[in-house]
From Swiss-Prot:
Pathway(s): Cofactor biosynthesis; adenosylcobalamin biosynthesis
Biological source species: Pseudoalteromonas translucida (strain TAC 125)
Pfam families reported in the protein's UniProt record: CbiA (PF01656), GATase_3 (PF07685)
NCBIfam families per UniProt: cobQ, PRK00784.1
Domain of life, per lineage: Bacteria
Name used for this protein in its record: Cobyric acid synthase
Length: 492
C-alpha cells in the first residue's frame, strides 16, 4: 500500500507506475483504493462509477476498470457534504458527521471488494488517501492505516520534496502512527526531486538511521508529465499564437475536467480556464463543463456576470458548448424536486435553448458509442455518461448525437441550435477521439487543419515513461522482497 505524507504527494502516480512496472513483468496486478474523494470519475463496463485515478491505474495494469477497484467514492456537492457511492452505485448524500458514523458499514464494502480482488489477482497495489497521520480522522479509518491493519498490508510512504520539508513530513508522519502501524511501514519514497542527488545523500542516510526504514527510491521531477488529473486543474497554459482559443468556465463544483486533457495537450489550441472574478476573454468557443451541483454552479455563473458575457460572445460570432450539467444550464430551467444535489429546487437557466432539465434519483452511468451530427457530417465517437437528470424540449428534436444502441434505450442526445452556434451533450470524453475533436474544431473554424492529439496513445506513452523512471530510480527488487516476505509471513 502506498500512503502519502500529504495530499498530492504522488500516491496515485506511483501506484499507476508500479501497476505498469509489474504488468510489464507479467504479473496479474490490480489497483485498489478503499476510499476516494473526487469529482472526476469514470464509468466501468458494468455501469458503475469509480475514481478517475483508479481507471487510469487499471489501464496501467492492463486490465479493465471495475467497481471493486474503488469501493467507496465520495463526490463532494457542498463544503460539508458529498454523494456517497458504494460499489459503483450512488447511495445517498451525507454530511461529513453522518458519514463518519457510517464508516463501519463502508468498511464492510471495502473488505468485500478487497477479498474478491485478492482471490483473482497476484498482487494488489493499494493507494491511500490524504495522510495516515490526520489525528481527527483516525477513528474508524478505512482509507489508510485502518484498512492496512484490517487486511495486514505492508505500507510505503511517499513524500513530495518539491514542496519542501520532506524530512519533517516523513519523520512527523511516522511519529504520529501507532507502534503496530510504524512496524507496517517498510520504507520511504521521495518524489519530484530536481538537482544533484549527491547533495541529498546525507539527508537520506540520516533518515534511514533515525527511522530504521530504508529509502526505496528518489524519483526525479518529470517535466511535462500529463496524465488524467484527479483533482487539480492546470490552468497556466496560455499560448500566444494558438490557432483556436477556447474558454472553460471554472465553476466551483466542476466535474470531469479531464474532458479537456486532449485539447490542453495540443500546441495550437489555447485553453483559458475562466475563474472567479475573471471575464470571459475573446475566444472561438466557450464551454460550460460538467458540474456536481448544477443549480449552485448556475447561480455562481450568473453572479459572475458570465450569463451576460456568454450572450455577448454569441452576438459577436462565438460558439458555446455545454457538457452534461453545462448543457442543462443552457436550457430554460433546471428542476431538482427531490433535492438530489442541493436544497435549491428550481432555477431559471440561461434560456439559450428551448428545453428543461429535471434531476432524478436514478443516475445514468454508461459507456456509449454514438454518431455526432455536425458540419453536415456524421462522425462515429464514443464516451461516457454520468448524470442524474433528464432533459426534454423542442430543442432536442435536433440532436447533437444519435445512438444505434444505448443501455437505457435512448436514441439521441443533446442538441445543436438552428443557427449552428450552440450545442449541448451529456457525453463526457468527447475530445478523446481525434475525429470528433477535428469536427468540433471545424465547427468553430471551417478551415481548421489541426491534427488533434490521440489521447489514448499519449496516455500509453506517459505510463511507459513512468514505468521506465521507476525501473531506474526505485529499488524494485526491494519492493518485491517486501511483498514476497510479507506473503511468506502470512502463510506460516
Amino acid at each position: 500500500m502506498v500512503q502519502g505524507t500529504t495530499s498530492d504527494a504522488g500516491k496515485s502516480t506511483l501506484v499507476a507506475a508500479l501497476c505498469r512496472v509489474f504488468a510489464n513483468r507479467g504479473l496479474n496486478v490490480a489497483p485498489f483504493k478503499p476510499q476516494n474523494m473526487a469529482l472526476n470519475s469514470a464509468v466501468t463496463d458494468d455501469g458503475g462509477e469509480i475514481g478517475r485515478a483508479q481507471a487510469l491505474q487499471a489501464i496501467a495494469a492492463k486490465v479493465a476498470p471495475e467497481t471493486d477497484f474503488n469501493p467507496i467514492l465520495l463526490k463532494p456537492n457542498s463544503d460539508t457534504g458529498a454523494q456517497v457511492i458504494i460499489h459503483g452505485k450512488a447511495m445517498s448524500n451525507m454530511e461529513a458527521g453522518a458519514y463518519h458514523d457510517y464508516k463501519k458499514v463502508a468498511m464492510d464494502a471495502v473488505l468485500t471488494s478487497h477479498n474478491r480482488l485478492a482471490k483473482r489477482f497476484d498482487l494488489l497495489l493499494v493507494e491511500g488517501a490524504g495522510s495516515p497521520a490526520e489525528i481527527n480522522l483516525r477513528a474508524n479509518d478505512i482509507a489508510n492505516m485502518g484498512y492496512a491493519e484490517a487486511v495486514d498490508c505492508p505500507v510505503i510512504i511517499i513524500a513530495d520534496i518539491d514542496k519542501g520539508g520532506v524530512f519533517a513530513h516523513l519523520v512527523g508522519t511516522l511519529a504520529l502512527l501507532s507502534e503496530s502501524e510504524q512496524a507496517r511501514v517498510k520504507g520511504f519514497v521521495i518524489n519530484r526531486f530536481r538537482g544533484d542527488i549527491s547533495l541529498l545523500q546525507s539527508g537520506l542516510d540520516w533518515l534511514e538511521q533515525y527511522t530504521g526504514k530504508p529509502v526505496l527510491g528518489v524519483l526525479p521531477y518529470l517535466h511535462d508529465l500529463a496524465l488524467d488529473a484527479e483533482d487539480a486543474i492546470a490552468i497556466d497554459n496560455t499560448l500566444t499564437n494558438a490557432s483556436v482559443n477556447i474558454a472553460v468556465l471554472l465553476v466551483p463544483h466542476i466535474s470531469n475536467h479531464t474532458d479537456f486533457d486532449a485539447l490542453r495537450l495540443h500546441p495550437n489550441i489555447n485553453i483559458n480556464y475562466v475563474a472567479h472574478t475573471q471575464a470571459i476573454p475573446d475566444v472561438d468557443l466557450t464551454i460550460l463543463p460538467g458540474s456536481k451541483n448544477v443549480l449552485s454552479d448556475l447561480a455562481f455563473l450568473k453572479n459572475e456576470g458570465w450569463d451576460t458575457q456568454i450572450k455577448r460572445h454569441l452576438r459577436y460570432g462565438g460558439k458555446v458548448l455545454g457538457i452534461c450539467g453545462g448543457m442543462q444550464m443552457l436550457g430554460n430551467s433546471i428542476n431538482d424536486p427531490l433535492g438530489v444535489e442541493s436544497s435549491l429546487q428550481q432555477m431559471p437557466g440561461l434560456a439559450l435553448s428551448d428545453f428543461t432539465s429535471t434531476l432524478t434519483a436514478q443516475k445514468i452511468l454508461s459507456n456509449v458509442t454514438a454518431t455526432m451530427q455536425l458540419n453536415n457530417q456524421q462522425i462515429l465517437c464514443s464516451g461516457y455518461e454520468i448524470h442524474a437528470g433528464i432533459s426534454q424540449g423542442e430543442a432536442l428534436n435536433k440532436p447533437f448525437l444519435s445512438f444505434n444502441e444505448h443501455p437505457n434505450g435512448f436514441t439521441a442526445d443533446g442538441f445543436i441550435s438552428d443557427d449552428n452556434a450552440i450545442a449541448g451533450t451529456y457525453l463526457h470524453g468527447l475530445f478523446d477521439q481525434a475525429s470528433a475533436t477535428l469536427q468540433i474544431l471545424k465547427w468553430l473554424k471551417a478551415d481548421t487543419v489541426i491534427n488533434p492529439v490521440n489521447i489514448n496513445q499519449h496516455r500509453e506513452q506517459q505510463l511507459e515513461r513512468l514505468a521506465a523512471m521507476c525501473e531506474t530510480h526505485l529499488n524494485i527488487a526491494h519492493i518485491i522482497k517486501i511483498y514476497e516476505g510479507h506473503n511468506h509471513e502470512r502463510t506460516k
